[in-house]
Curated annotation (Swiss-Prot):
GO terms for biological process: fructose import across plasma membrane; phosphoenolpyruvate-dependent sugar phosphotransferase system. The gene is fruB. Keywords: Cytoplasm, Kinase, Phosphoprotein, Phosphotransferase system, Sugar transport, Transferase, Transport. PROSITE patterns: PTS_EIIA_TYPE_2, PTS_EIIA_TYPE_2_HIS, PTS_HPR_DOM, PTS_HPR_HIS, PTS_HPR_SER. The modification Phosphohistidine is found at H62, H299. It is found in: Cytoplasm. InterPro entries: HPr-like (IPR000032), HPr-like_sf (IPR035895), PTrfase/Anion_transptr (IPR016152), PTS_EIIA_type-2_dom (IPR002178), PTS_HPr_His_P_site (IPR001020), PTS_HPr_Ser_P_site (IPR002114), Sugar_PTS (IPR050893). One of its GO terms (cellular component) is cytoplasm. The PTS EIIA type-2 domain is phosphorylated by phospho-HPr on a histidyl residue. Then, it transfers the phosphoryl group to the PTS EIIB type-2 domain. Residues 285-375 form the HPr domain. PANTHER family: MANNITOL PERMEASE IIC COMPONENT, MULTIPHOSPHORYL TRANSFER PROTEIN. This is Multiphosphoryl transfer protein. It holds the Pfam family PTS-HPr.
Length: 376
């Protein structure tokens, strides 16, 4: 994981416009020995090609491929502008993270930062922070509680099972492996009868042994009988804060609407969307899957091209990295798209709902096939 030094963070700075802000960041990169004097020209040129504004008040100015020879060593400089700097199209940046990288070394850092910065509350804290130490803690995620663990790694779907104990053991093992529970939780979760929520869904938890919030889901290939009641899926919850409540509410809503069968039929990505997103696909949604061929995945430039393509349409569009966490993201947010951690060869599923959904998916597919501004 990239380590950010407080010496690389500059709180309380001022800039009259975007160009002045970029020049300040470039000068700091030169001073730190990251780049030569000519790198600033690449940073300004990059901004002319594609805005480096990520969203949530964050911009990531960096050079073009033509100025990679100006990079002496990979590094970043973070500038905070409490009064804000207009970054174009009504966008205001309060934090600019200047990046110097000669290859794709910065992509891991970028994904690390976007996972932190995609939290709206953290972005607001970055704006109001007053010290380099506070900014560093926010950027490195040290002030964040661990996010709810519910992704592809927590799912066991369509297994051969004829009793709840099999599902209980699988979920307990997943939670233990994720560091979410201790041995006490595992013992209780396996020995105590889960709660029947109805429609084939059962729930398991424990008041003891919760180390972090996480949810594991196991689903049988075929429903089976438990003392005259139907069982098909078990949801096991480790609760160390209130994060699981939102998931349980979505689950309750599906049950109240008699739509729990959607969970029993869904693939992994759709199941995660139903439990973790308020923008989960409905029955009338269209979807399509495409493979990213860009050498360095979806970093800022191709990510921007993708988001700009999506913004041409009125439909609600989400994107899921099927080779990542499996959670859907708002396709109109560059920050959330970059945070998906898309690498070359990863499969993306797009869902679109609206009058122009079909046209949107075709345009997205064409844009990806064309290389998202980097050539096919």
């Amino acid at each position: 994981m990239f380590q950010l030094s407080v010496q690389d963070i500059h709180p309380g700075e001022k800039a009259g416009d975007k160009e002045e802000a970029i020049r300040q960041v470039a000068a700091a990169l030169v001073q730190a020995g990251n780049v030569a004097e000519g790198y600033v020209n690449g940073m300004l040129a990059r901004e002319q090609q594609t805005s480096t504004f990520l969203g949530n008040g964050i911009a990531i100015p960096h050079g073009t491929t033509d100025t990679r020879d100006q990079v002496l060593k990979t590094g970043v400089q973070v500038f905070q502008f409490p009064e804000g700097v207009t970054w174009g199209d009504g966008q205001v940046a309060y934090v600019a993270i200047g990046i110097a990288a000669s290859s794709d070394e910065h992509l891991g850092l970028l994904r690390q930062l976007t996972h932190v910065l995609s939290d709206d509350s953290v972005a607001e804290q970055l704006k109001s922070a007053t010290t380099a130490e506070e900014l560093r803690a926010l950027l490195m995620g040290e002030k964040q509680s661990e996010q709810l663990k519910l992704d592809n790694e927590m799912l066991t779907l369509d297994i051969v099972a004829s009793d709840l104990l099999t599902l209980q053991a699988l979920n307990a093992a997943r939670l233990k492996e994720a560091g979410a529970v201790d041995a006490t939780f595992v013992t209780k979760a396996i020995n105590e009868q889960p709660l029947n929520l109805g429609q084939g869904i059962w729930l398991s938890d424990s008041a003891e042994g919760n180390l972090r919030s996480a949810i594991a889901v196991s689903r049988a290939a075929n429903a089976f009988d438990v003392d005259g009641e139907t069982a098909a899926m078990l949801v096991s919850v480790a609760m160390n804060d209130d994060q699981p409540i939102a998931v349980l509410k979505r689950l309750a809503d599906l049950l109240l609407d008699n739509k729990a069968d959607r969970l029993l039929k869904a693939d992994a990505a759709t199941l995660l969307a139903l439990l973790t997103s308020d923008d989960a696909p409905t029955d009338d949604v269209l979807s399509a899957e495409f493979v990213v061929r860009n050498e360095h995945g979806l970093h800022a430039r191709p990510g921007t091209m993708l988001v700009n393509t999506i913004k041409q349409f009125n439909s609600d569009i989400t994107v899921t990295n099927l080779d990542g966490t499996g959670k859907p993201a708002n396709g109109r947010s560059l920050m959330k798209v970059v945070a998906l951690g898309v690498k070359k060869g990863h499969r993306l599923r797009f869902t679109a709902q609206g009058a122009d959904a079909e046209q949107a998916l075709k345009a997205i597919g064409d844009a990806i096939a064309a290389g998202l501004g980097e050539g096919a």
